A protein has these predicted regions:
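Beta-strand-dominated extracellular/periplasmic modules and repeats
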Residues: 1-145
Length: 145
C-alpha cells in the first residue's frame, strides 16, 4: 500500500500586489510619465517578414464571466522559426519583430494582437515544433486549487 508523502505540500500562492496589471501597462490606466509607450504594445513594425495575422480572444472565468482585470502576454518565434531572444543561437532574427506582446483585457475580457504567423522551430532531434504562440495570463485571484 502506498503512503502519502506529507512533506510534499502545495506551494502557497503568492501575489504580486494590487498593481500588477497597472504597473505592466501604466499608460492604459492613465498613469503618465512612466514610459512613453507600454512595453509589448507592438509585436511587429513596418517591414516585418511573414504573413500578418490578428490574434483575438476573450478571457473568462470558470462561470463564463469575462475577466476584464487581467493582462495577456504572447511569446512566439518569427516567420522563420527564430526567437528574438538572447538565448537564440541562430542568426537571422527579423529586426522588425519583437517576439512578444502585452495587452490588457478590456472590461469584456477581450484582447487583440497584430502579429505574424510563427514559423516552425527546429528541435535538437532534427524535427520541428508545430508553429505556435504561447499565452501568459496575469489576473487577480489566480490560484492553484
Amino acid at each position: 500500500m502506498s503512503k502519502p508523502l506529507d512533506y510534499l505540500k502545495e506551494t502557497p500562492s503568492q501575489t504580486a500586489g494590487p498593481y500588477v496589471h497597472i504597473g505592466m501597462t501604466p499608460n492604459e490606466y492613465d498613469i503618465g510619465g512612466v514610459i512613453p509607450e507600454d512595453l509589448g504594445l507592438r509585436v511587429v513594425s513596418d517591414g516585418v517578414k511573414g504573413e500578418r495575422i490578428k490574434v483575438t480572444g476573450r478571457v473568462i472565468d470558470g462561470g463564463g464571466n469575462p475577466v476584464g482585470d487581467c493582462v495577456v502576454e504572447i511569446w512566439q518565434a518569427d516567420a522563420n522559426g527564430i526567437y528574438n531572444s538572447p538565448m537564440e543561437h541562430r542568426s537571422g532574427v527579423d529586426p522588425n519583430f519583437s517576439g512578444w506582446g502585452r495587452q490588457p483585457a478590456g472590461s469584456s475580457g477581450e484582447f487583440s494582437f497584430d502579429t505574424i504567423k510563427p514559423g516552425q522551430v527546429p528541435l535538437a532531434s532534427g524535427g520541428f515544433m508545430a508553429p505556435h504562440i504561447t499565452f501568459w495570463i496575469v489576473a487577480r485571484g489566480i490560484n492553484v486549487g
